[in-house]
C-alpha cells in the first residue's frame, strides 16, 4: 500500500480518541434532504479552441490530472464537502505569451472538485472534525481520490411524520375549561394527547395526515377522503362522474407519495427520563430514553383524562394480554468490530403504515452488503486501464443501497425511448473525459502540405481542394468526435452535406477524407456509411464509369437472407439514412468481389477497420448496466509497444500507395500533365510522414482512452462489430399490448450539428494540426526535440459522479411512467378452475385448468409481450420430464392439451407443480385424464383467479395484486393521450432536481416524446423490418425478460404498503348501496340501518312495473304489483313493498319521483344497490354542509360517485327552557346499508351523569395502542395474546396501530459520505495492455 510520509506522520500523531464535534446535519428535521448537491466538476478542461505551440504547451502543468505518470499526488477529499453548497468556480485569469509571434491565451483553470475537497478533508483531519472511527481507518493511507455512494437516494429526518393522524370534532357546550393537573415532567409526555382528546370531543377520526400529504401533491383532504383534480380526465363520460375520477386520482396520488417515500430516520433529540419526577403510569411506558417529540396516542390518556369510562376502558385494554404499549428505546445494534452503535429501535407514536416504510428503507440500506470493494470497482471502471486502488472497508458505518443493474438498465432504455437527447448527455460526459485526458490538442502550426510543395497550377488546385475541406482546428469538435466513438446512439446520424463534382484529380481529397474517417472513427463511419456511399458512387461514376455501371447493375443495396447470403437489389438507388435501421445495407461495403470492378473493390477495401472488439470487463465487474449478454466495444486500434512496425502507420502507407496508383491511372487515362501526378504524390507522401509521427499517440495512448471509456457506466450499448458488411445495431423497443412500440433509436430524431450531423473533415486537423504527449516525447513534434510531457490520468470520480447523477435523474424521470404502467398492468389475471383429484383436497389443491378462450384473450397476449417460446402440447404420451423441460425452457408453467388421455405420472406432475392446463373447454374434463384419478369429478372444482405474474414464475407482485385489481376496477377507461396526461401530472410532483449535474441533465433532455401507452410495457428487440422478436435468453439480458413494471425492489415493497393503506376500509371509505325509508330521526345515528318491517313484499325493480295510465282524468304513473297484478295509479295506498333496485339505468325522473312518493305515502322501503358514495359524519354543531336528495341518487348517471353526509346526534345539546318548541318532527330518507363510521376511533368523550358512559360512546381500539414488536425480518407485529405465540403482522389486518417500533440510524452511520481511497496510476501508458486477458 502506498503512503505519503507527510500526511501519514501527521495523522499518526493525532489524538485518536478525542470526541469530535457532531455534525449538525446529523440531527436535521423533517424535510432535510440527505441527497447531496454535486458539482459538475472540471469536465472539459481542454474545452474550447486553443491554438498552442509546442513551446507554449510545455510551460503548462495539467491541473486536472491529479495523478501524474508513475507518481501519486497527495490529494485528500472531504466527505462532508459534498454536503456543502455547490462550489463556485474560481476566477479565470488570462496571460498572453509571444512564441514565434503567435499570441497564446492560457487559462488558469479553476480547481477541480477533488482538489477543492482536498483542503476540506485535511482541515477536518487536523481540526478533529472527522468522526473518530473514520480517523483511525484513514491513518497511514495516502488519500487522493473520493468514491461517492453508488446509490444514494434517501432523505434523512429525525422527526418522522406519519401517513395517518387523529382529527377531532368538538362540541363546545360540553368542553370543560379546567385542565387535569399533571406534573411538569408528566405533561411533557402526556400533554399533547390530553390536549387533543379533551373533554367534549364528539368524534375522533383517523384521517390521512395533511402534514405528510402536503399541498404540493394536489391532494384535497377537506372531505376526509383524498381528492385530486386533473389527473385522470375521462372523456365521454356522463356529467357527474368527475367525483369518481377525482377520488381514484386521490388514491393514486397517495399511493405514489408512499411509493416514493425515501425517508431514513436518524436519532434526533432524546431524553433519559428521571423516574422520581414521573408518575408510576408514565414510568411504566417509558424506556431508558425516548424521543422528545412524543406525539399522540390514546394510551397516554390513562389516569390523565377526565372521562371516567374512557379511563377505565383504556386501563383494562392495556392490562389485558395482547396489548403492550411502550415509548422509547427498544433495541440497540452494534458494529462489533469498532464497538459503536449503528442502529437503534424506538417505539414511536406513528401509524404502522409509515413505520413499515421507514423500516423498509433502513433495512434495504443496511442489508445491501455493499462493500468498499464495490465502490472501488465502480471507480476503477471510470479510471484509466490498469489503475490500482487501495481503501478500507468501513462496513456498516458507510452503508448504501446495492447498485441495481437490472433496474438501471431498464430505466435507461425507457429514458432513451422517451428522451432521444439522452445521447447528447452521455456524449457530453465522455467528451469531458477526453478533454481532461489531454490526449490531443491543437497547435498553431499547420502541416497540411510539405514545405517544398511544387508551385504550379496543379498544386494550386490541390491546395484549394484541401483547404475547402480542412477547417481550423476546433479542439471541442475533436474531443466530441473521439467521445462519440464509444457513446450509445439513440438517433440516426447523417453525413454533413458535401458539394463535390469529382471532375478534378484533386477531388481525391474527399475520398481520402472518408478513408481517414473510417480509420480514426470506424463506429461513427459505420453509422453514416450509407450517406458516404452516395458520395463515393458519384466519384466512381466520374472516374470509373465502366466499373460504376457494372456495380449499379448488381445493385446499390443488398439484404442478408436467413442463410446468411447477400441478396443485391439490382437497382441503382440513392441511399436514404432512414434505411440504416432497416434490413438494407449499402452495397459498396459488402466486400463481395465483382468481376469488372476491380478498382472500386480495391478502393473499398481501404475502408476495412483495423481495430478489435474489447469486452467491457471493468463495467461487468462493477455491475454496471449493459444491454447485451456479451457487452463489447469496438476499439479503433490497439497499442503497438514491442512491435517492430506500427500496424496503424503501415495501414496508412498502404492507403497512400493505393491512392497514388489511382491518381496515376486516372492521369494516364486523361492524359494529365506529369506535374499533376507529381504534386499529388508529393502531398500523399507528406501525409504519410505526418501519419507516421502521430500513429503512436493513437495506438498507445488514445486506444487506452477508448478502452477506458468503454467501461463507463452510461456507455451501455455495444457500438460496432468491426464488420461494415453485416453489422446492424441491436434495435430495442418499449412494447405495449396494443401492438405499438417506442424505439430506443429514433429513425427521425433530432438533427444536431456535431452530434447527429457528422462532419468527416475533422480528420484533417487531427492529422495535420494537433499534437500529442507521446508525439512530443518521441521528438517528432514541432519542437523537433524530445519533450517529456507527462501523461494525464483524469480523476475518475468526476465522470462517475456525473454518470450516477444522470442515472438518478433518469430513474426519477421514468418513475411516473413506471407507476402508471404498474397500475394498468399489475394484477392481470385469468379465470381458472382447480379440479380436486383427491378426497381430502382443499379448494386450491388439484389440477389447474383454463380454456382456450381465456388463454387467447389473456395469457396469449401476455406471452407475445414477454416473447417466451410457446408452451408444449401435451398428449396421452407426454411424460413428466417432457413437461418439466418445457416449463424450464419457456419460464411459463403452461401446457396446451391436444389429445388423448393424460397418464397418471403426467397428471401427478401437473398437480404437484401447479402447471396450468389449457383445455378446449370444460366439457367432461375427467375423461381426458387417466382413470387413476378416481376422485376427480366434473362438478368438483373451485373457480378462482390466477395471477399472470404467477404463471410466469415472476411473483414479484402477487401479494398486492388483489389491491391493484380493486384500484383498476375504480378507474375509468383511458386512452393513450389520457394516460400520457396522467403520467405528466404525476411527473410534476416527482423530485428529480437533486444534483447540480442533474439540473443540467434536465435542461438538456428537452421535451418528452412519450407516445406509447404505458401498459404491460416490456423491452424487446425488433428485426430491421420492425417485427417484434420474442425474448431470447441466448441474446437478451435477464433484465429484459420481465420489466417488473420498471420499478425496483424497494419501490415495489413501499408500493405494497401503500396499496394496503389506500385499500384499508378505514381510509378508502367508499361504500355501495343506500336504503330509502321515511322515518323520524330525533336521535340520528350515522350507522343506523333500519330494519324492513315484517309483512313487506320483496320486489325486484323492472321498467315494466311502472307505466302510464289514465286515472281521475289525468295521466298518472301506475305501479303494477307483481304478486297480484293489481295496478295502483296513486302513490297512496299501495301495498307494503321492499323494492330492490340493482340497476338504475333507464329510470326516468317521473318513475323516480313516483317511487319516492311511495316511500313517503305508502311506507315503501327501497334499496338502491348500484350507487357508490363516500361518507362523512357530521356533528350537531357543524350541521350539514351539503345536501343530496333521494331523487338525485335515483336518477344520477352511472359512474357518479356521491359524497353523502350523515349526522351523529349523540352529543346534540339538550334544549333549555328558553328554546322555542319544535314545530314538527325531524324526518330522514337516506340510510346506509352498512356502517359508515369506519374512520372513527372514539366517540362522545364526555361523562354521563358525571360518571357513567353515554349510550353509544366508543373507546379507541386496543390495536391503536399496541406497540407490539419488530420481527427479525422487519415486519411489525401485534403483541401475541398468549405466551409462546407469534403476533399477527400489522399489515395483514385492517386494524390501525399508532404505536410502532421504528429503526433509526445513529450518528455513526454516514450514508451521505464519500469514501476516500488511494489511487495508484499506471507507470507507463504505453505498457498498458488494453486487450482482455
Curated annotation (Swiss-Prot):
Region (Disordered): 1-71
Bias-annotated ranges (Low complexity): 1-10
Composition-biased stretches (Basic and acidic residues): 11-21
Subcellular location: Virion
Ranges of biased composition (kind: Polar residues): 22-42
TM region positions: none
InterPro entries: VP1/VP3_C, VP1_protrusion
Keywords: Capsid protein, Inner capsid protein, T=2 icosahedral capsid protein, Virion
GO (cellular component) term, any one: T=2 icosahedral viral capsid
Principal location class: virion
Assembly with partners or alone: Homodecamer; each decamer is made up of two conformers of VP2, called VP2A and VP2B. 12 homodecamers assemble to form an icosahedral capsid.
The family this protein is said to belong to: Belongs to the turreted BTV-fold inner capsid family.
Name recorded for this polypeptide: Inner capsid protein VP1
Source organism of the structure: Bombyx mori cytoplasmic polyhedrosis virus (BmCPV)
Amino acid at each position: 500500500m502506498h503512503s505519503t510520509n507527510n500526511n501519514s506522520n501527521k495523522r499518526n500523531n493525532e489524538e485518536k480518541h478525542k470526541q469530535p464535534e457532531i455534525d449538525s446535519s446529523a440531527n436535521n428535521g423533517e424535510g432535510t434532504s440527505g441527497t447531496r448537491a454535486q458539482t459538475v466538476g472540471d469536465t472539459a478542461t481542454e474545452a474550447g479552441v486553443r491554438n498552442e505551440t509546442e513551446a507554449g504547451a510545455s510551460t503548462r502543468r495539467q491541473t486536472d490530472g491529479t495523478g501524474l505518470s508513475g507518481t501519486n499526488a497527495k490529494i485528500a477529499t472531504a466527505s462532508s464537502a459534498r454536503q456543502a453548497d455547490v462550489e463556485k468556480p474560481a476566477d479565470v485569469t488570462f496571460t498572453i505569451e509571444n512564441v514565434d509571434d503567435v499570441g497564446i491565451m492560457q487559462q488558469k483553470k479553476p480547481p477541480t472538485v477533488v482538489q477543492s475537497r482536498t483542503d476540506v478533508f485535511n482541515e477536518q483531519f487536523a481540526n478533529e472534525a472527522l468522526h473518530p472511527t473514520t480517523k483511525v481507518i484513514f491513518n497511514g493511507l495516502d488519500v487522493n481520490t473520493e468514491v461517492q455512494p453508488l446509490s444514494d437516494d434517501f432523505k434523512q429526518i429525525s422527526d418522522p411524520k406519519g401517513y395517518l393522524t387523529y382529527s377531532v370534532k368538538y362540541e363546545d357546550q360540553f368542553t370543560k375549561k379546567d385542565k387535569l393537573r399533571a406534573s411538569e415532567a408528566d405533561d411533557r409526555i402526556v400533554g399533547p394527547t390530553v390536549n387533543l382528546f379533551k373533554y367534549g370531543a364528539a368524534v375522533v377520526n383517523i384521517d390521512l395526515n395533511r402534514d405528510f400529504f402536503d399541498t404540493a401533491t394536489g391532494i384535497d383532504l377537506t372531505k376526509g377522503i383524498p381528492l385530486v383534480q386533473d389527473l385522470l380526465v375521462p372523456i365521454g363520460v356522463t356529467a357527474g362522474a368527475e367525483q369518481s375520477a377525482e377520488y381514484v386520482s386521490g388514491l393514486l396520488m397517495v399511493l405514489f407519495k408512499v411509493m416514493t417515500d425515501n425517508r431514513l430516520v436518524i436519532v434526533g433529540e432524546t431524553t433519559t427520563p428521571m423516574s422520581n419526577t414521573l408518575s408510576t403510569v408514565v414510568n411504566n411506558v417509558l424506556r431508558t430514553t425516548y424521543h422528545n417529540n412524543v406525539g399522540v396516542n390514546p394510551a397516554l390518556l390513562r389516569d390523565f383524562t377526565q372521562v371516567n369510562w374512557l379511563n377505565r376502558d383504556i386501563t383494562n385494554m392495556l392490562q389485558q394480554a395482547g396489548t403492550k404499549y411502550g415509548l422509547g428505546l427498544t433495541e440497540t445494534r452494534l458494529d462489533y468490530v469498532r464497538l459503536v452503535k449503528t442502529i437503534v429501535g424506538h417505539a414511536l407514536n406513528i401509524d404502522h403504515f409509515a413505520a413499515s416504510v421507514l423500516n423498509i428503507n433502513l433495512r434495504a440500506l443496511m442489508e445491501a452488503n455493499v462493500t468498499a470493494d464495490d465502490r472501488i470497482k465502480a471507480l476503477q471502471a471510470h479510471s484509466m486501464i490498469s489503475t490500482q486502488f487501495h481503501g478500507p472497508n468501513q462496513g456498516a458505518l458507510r452503508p448504501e443501497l446495492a447498485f441495481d443493474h437490472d433496474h438501471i438498465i431498464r430505466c435507461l432504455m425507457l429514458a432513451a425511448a422517451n428522451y432521444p437527447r439522452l445521447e447528447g448527455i452521455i456524449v457530453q460526459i465522455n467528451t469531458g473525459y477526453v478533454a481532461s485526458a489531454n490526449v490531443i490538442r491543437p497547435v498553431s502550426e499547420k502541416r497540411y502540405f510539405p514545405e517544398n510543395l511544387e508551385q504550379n497550377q496543379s498544386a494550386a488546385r490541390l491546395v484549394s481542394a484541401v483547404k475547402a475541406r480542412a477547417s481550423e482546428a476546433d479542439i471541442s469538435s475533436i474531443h466530441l468526435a473521439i467521445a462519440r466513438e464509444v457513446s450509445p446512439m439513440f438517433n440516426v446520424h447523417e453525413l454533413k452535406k458535401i458539394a463535390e463534382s469529382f471532375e478534378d484529380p484533386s477531388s481525391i481529397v474527399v475520398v481520402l477524407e472518408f478513408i481517414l474517417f473510417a480509420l480514426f472513427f470506424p463506429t461513427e463511419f459505420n453509422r453514416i456509411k450509407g450517406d458516404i456511399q452516395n458520395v463515393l458512387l458519384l466519384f466512381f461514376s466520374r472516374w470509373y464509369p465502366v466499373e460504376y455501371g457494372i456495380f449499379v447493375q448488381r445493385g446499390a443495396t443488398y439484404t442478408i437472407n436467413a442463410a446468411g447470403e447477400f441478396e443485391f437489389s439490382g437497382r441503382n438507388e440513392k441511399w436514404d439514412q432512414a434505411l440504416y435501421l432497416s434490413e438494407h445495407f449499402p452495397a459498396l461495403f459488402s466486400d463481395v468481389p465483382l468481376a469488372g470492378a476491380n478498382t472500386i473493390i480495391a478502393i473499398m477495401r481501404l475502408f476495412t477497420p483495423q481495430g478489435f472488439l474489447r469486452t467491457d470487463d471493468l463495467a461487468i465487474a462493477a455491475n454496471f448496466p449493459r444491454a447485451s449478454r456479451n457487452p463489447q466495444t469496438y476499439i479503433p486500434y490497439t497499442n503497438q509497444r514491442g512491435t517492430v512496425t506500427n500496424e496503424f502507420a503501415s495501414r496508412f502507407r498502404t492507403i497512400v500507395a493505393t491512392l497514388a496508383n489511382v491518381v496515376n491511372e486516372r492521369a494516364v487515362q486523361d492524359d494529365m500533365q506529369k506535374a499533376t501526378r507529381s504534386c499529388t504524390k508529393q502531398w500523399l507522401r507528406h501525409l504519410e510522414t505526418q501519419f507516421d509521427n502521430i500513429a503512436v499517440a493513437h495506438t498507445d495512448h488514445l486506444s487506452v482512452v477508448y478502452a477506458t471509456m468503454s467501461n463507463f457506466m452510461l456507455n451501455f450499448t455495444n457500438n460496432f462489430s468491426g464488420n461494415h458488411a453485416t453489422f446492424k445495431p441491436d434495435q430495442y423497443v418499449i412494447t405495449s399490448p396494443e401492438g405499438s412500440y417506442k424505439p430506443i433509436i429514433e429513425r427521425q430524431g433530432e438533427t444536431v450539428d456535431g452530434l447527429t450531423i457528422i462532419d468527416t473533415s475533422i480528420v484533417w486537423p487531427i492529422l495535420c494540426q494537433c499534437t500529442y504527449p507521446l508525439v512530443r516525447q518521441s521528438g517528432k513534434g514541432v519542437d523537433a526535440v524530445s519533450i517529456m510531457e507527462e501523461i494525464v490520468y483524469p480523476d475518475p470520480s468526476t465522470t462517475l459522479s456525473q454518470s450516477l447523477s444522470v442515472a438518478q435523474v433518469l430513474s426519477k424521470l421514468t418513475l411516473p411512467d413506471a407507476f402508471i404502467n404498474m397500475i394498468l398492468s399489475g394484477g392481470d389475471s385469468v379465470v381458472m378452475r382447480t379440479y380436486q383429484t383427491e378426497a381430502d383436497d382443499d379448494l386450491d389443491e388439484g389440477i389447474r385448468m383454463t380454456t382456450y378462450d381465456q388463454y387467447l384473450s389473456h395469457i396469449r397476449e401476455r406471452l407475445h409481450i414477454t416473447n417466451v417460446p410457446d408452451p408444449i402440447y401435451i398428449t396421452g404420451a407426454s411424460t413428466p420430464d417432457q413437461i418439466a423441460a418445457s416449463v424450464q425452457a419457456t419460464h411459463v408453467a403452461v401446457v396446451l392439451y391436444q389429445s388423448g388421455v393424460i397418464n397418471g405420472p403426467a397428471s401427478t406432475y401437473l398437480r404437484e407443480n401447479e402447471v396450468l392446463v389449457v383445455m378446449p373447454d370444460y366439457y367432461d374434463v375427467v375423461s381426458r385424464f387417466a382413470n387413476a384419478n378416481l376422485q376427480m369429478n366434473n362438478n368438483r372444482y373451485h373457480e378462482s383467479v390466477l395471477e399472470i405474474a404467477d404463471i410466469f414464475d415472476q411473483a414479484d407482485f402477487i401479494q398486492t395484486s388483489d389491491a391493484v385489481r380493486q384500484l383498476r376496477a375504480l378507474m375509468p377507461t383511458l386512452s393513450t393521450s389520457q394516460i400520457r396526461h396522467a403520467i405528466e401530472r404525476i411527473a410534476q410532483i416527482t423530485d428529480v432536481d437533486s444534483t447540480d449535474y442533474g439540473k443540467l441533465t434536465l435542461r438538456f433532455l428537452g421535451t418528452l416524446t412519450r407516445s406509447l401507452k404505458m401498459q404491460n410495457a416490456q423491452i424487446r428487440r425488433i428485426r430491421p423490418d420492425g417485427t417484434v422478436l420474442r425474448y431470447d435468453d441466448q441474446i437478451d439480458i435477464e433484465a429484459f425478460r420481465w420489466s417488473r413494471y420498471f420499478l425496483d425492489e424497494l419501490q415495489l415493497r413501499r408500493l405494497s404498503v401503500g396499496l394496503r393503506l389506500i385499500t384499508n376500509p378505514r381510509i378508502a371509505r367508499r361504500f355501495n348501496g343506500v336504503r330509502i325509508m321515511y322515518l323520524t330521526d330525533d336521535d340520528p345515528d350515522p350507522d343506523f340501518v333500519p330494519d324492513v318491517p315484517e309483512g313487506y313484499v320483496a320486489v325486484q325493480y323492472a321498467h315494466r312495473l311502472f307505466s302510464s295510465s289514465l286515472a281521475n282524468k289525468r295521466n298518472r304513473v301506475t305501479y303494477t304489483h307483481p304478486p297480484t297484478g293489481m295496478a295502483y295509479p296513486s302513490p297512496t295506498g299501495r301495498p307494503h313493498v321492499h323494492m330492490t333496485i340493482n340497476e338504475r339505468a333507464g329510470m326516468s325522473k317521473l318513475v323516480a319521483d313516483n317511487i319516492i312518493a311511495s316511500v313517503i305515502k305508502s311506507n315503501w322501503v327501497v334499496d338502491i344497490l348500484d350507487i357508490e358514495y363516500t361518507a362523512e359524519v357530521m356533528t350537531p354543531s357543524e350541521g350539514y354542509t351539503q345536501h343530496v336528495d333521494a331523487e338525485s341518487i335515483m336518477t344520477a348517471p352511472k359512474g357518479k360517485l356521491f359524497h353523502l353526509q350523515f349526522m351523529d346526534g349523540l352529543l346534540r345539546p339538550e334544549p333549555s327552557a328558553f328554546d322555542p318548541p319544535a314545530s314538527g318532527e325531524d324526518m330522514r330518507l337516506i340510510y346506509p346499508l352498512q356502517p359508515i363510521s369506519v374512520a372513527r376511533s372514539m366517540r362522545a368523550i364526555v361523562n354521563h351523569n358525571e360518571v357513567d358512559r353515554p349510550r353509544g360512546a366508543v373507546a379507541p381500539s386496543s390495536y391503536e395502542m399496541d406497540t407490539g414488536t419488530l420481527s427479525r425480518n422487519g415486519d411489525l407485529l401485534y403483541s401475541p395474546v398468549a405466551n409462546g405465540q407469534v403476533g399477527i403482522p400489522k399489515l395483514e389486518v385492517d386494524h390501525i396501530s399508532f404505536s410502532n417500533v421504528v429503526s433509526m440510524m445513529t450518528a455513526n452511520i454516514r450514508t451521505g459520505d464519500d469514501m476516500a481511497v488511494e489511487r495508484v496510476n499506471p507507470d507507463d501508458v504505453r505498457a498498458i495492455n488494453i486487450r482482455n486477458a
